[in-house]
Amino acid sequence: MLGQTVELLSQLLWGRGTIALTLLCGLYFTAGTGFLPLTRLPTVLKRTVGSLFQKRDRKSGGVSPFAAVSTALGGTMGVGNIVGVGAALALGGAGSIFWMWIGAFLGMMTKYAEVLLAVRWRQRDKGAKALRGGPMYYISCGIPNAFGKALAVLFCVFCALASFSSGSMTQTGAIAEALQESFSLPPLLCAAALTLLCGWVLHGGCDRAVRTCSALVPLMSVFYLVGCGVVLLTFRQSIPDALTQIVSGAFSPASAAAGGASGFFVSMRVGIARGIFTHEAGLGSASIAHACSGADSPVEQGFWGIFEVFCDTILVCSVTALAILASEVPLGPSAAQAAFTLVMGPAGGRMLAVAVSLFAFASVISFCLYGQRCIEYLFPNSRLALPLYRLLFLTGCAAGCFAQLPLVFSLADLLNACLLLPNLAALLILSPQVFEATREYFAKGGTRSCSSAR
């Protein structure tokens, strides 16, 4: 009964209106910045990938831009990139991946706007070099009235709740399921180990979360992509057929599992919703991590937001989908594991279980940071709120190991929609600031403009 109710509410909030709003908002920012990901691609690459090989002193303090984007990627590159892609293929057919791509391309500029505003309106902790920011700050400061404050509070409440579903239960449930299937580890042991590890990260605060993600994200990404590369190399002759399925299935009424006249919209809805679950463009949560960056230019940190969506969806999710479709394994949440096992035997299944565990744990680390920032914003003077949140978060991590994944995924989709709507409203209101900052940056020839933390 509970699962049916959550699924019904999720479908209502992820209706045609929400899908259209998400796509139109992304198109608005893409067109308003002159199709920046395409027309300014050399600058974006130079200021992101190219900057990794340059050493610079940051005037604003904080963590490095790469460390910030690693933390954000830790939150976005969770089980949705592996388990979620298989589920999307089962629910929406191969065409759902095409709509995931469309949503990701437009979502790049939505994420860019979020990150730019988060860095522009970030604040410095009193008596410390640490920086904090995110939607609750750019909403309340950028819209300095009762409506803005109410919207900021609403975002924080939904983000804190989402940290229990998307950020803890979904991720730890996937870890427990993967380790039980591949290594026969009981869920109780997984729950105990994850609770201890997450408690260790929580105890270390923002610095420990950022350091852990900076080390974990590049390692887990390469590890997983190598495994997918082996699968694709084995079925390389089937890759063109897989791409054809994705493109043709996007416009076929009977492409989705639902079939019939509603199949087209089901494919689109599943692709957009699952895509947002992975890249989080429009949700605003990842901008909390970007706001910790000591980047002197909000625009340049916004470029890292574009990079984040590309890596998460265009790269990792696409590789997952191609590996599943090319290997022709049964579609579903465990499709990627079936593909790995088909090619590499039991060792492949174990390899994917490790990859799922790494992706999911990185997501847990990032979301515990997001949730804490929201609680600190809601209860700035409370000594009990943060310890209580941490206790509840750890409880959620343990409970996720025993939860039913379909129910948790539906709850995650529901809370994502609750996050999306107030954040998109704020982004549209604050869009003139995004366009002005972008024009000013490129009018100066793409040079850095210092943005002091408040």
Regions of interest found by a model, annotated:
Residues 1-79, 89-96, 107, 428-454:
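N-terminal alpha-helical transmembrane segments of multi-pass membrane transport
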Residues 2, 18, 32-37, 81-85, ...:
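Transmembrane helix-loop junctions in multi-pass membrane proteins
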Residues 16-32, 104-107, 152-166, 190-203, ...:
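Hydrophobic core segments of alpha-helical transmembrane domains in multi-pass membrane transport
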Residues 21-28, 32-45, 173-179, 185-194, ...:
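Membrane-interface loop-to-helix entry segments
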Residues 29-30, 103-129, 136, 140-173, ...:
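Helix-loop-helix module between adjacent transmembrane segments
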Residues 36-63, 87-89, 93-97, 109-146, ...:
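Flexible loop linkers connecting adjacent transmembrane helices
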Residues 56-91, 117-120, 127-136, 140-142, ...:
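Alpha-helical membrane segments and immediately flanking helix-loop junctions
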Residues 114-126, 228-245, 256-259, 291-293, ...:
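Extracellular/periplasmic helix-exit of transmembrane alpha-helices
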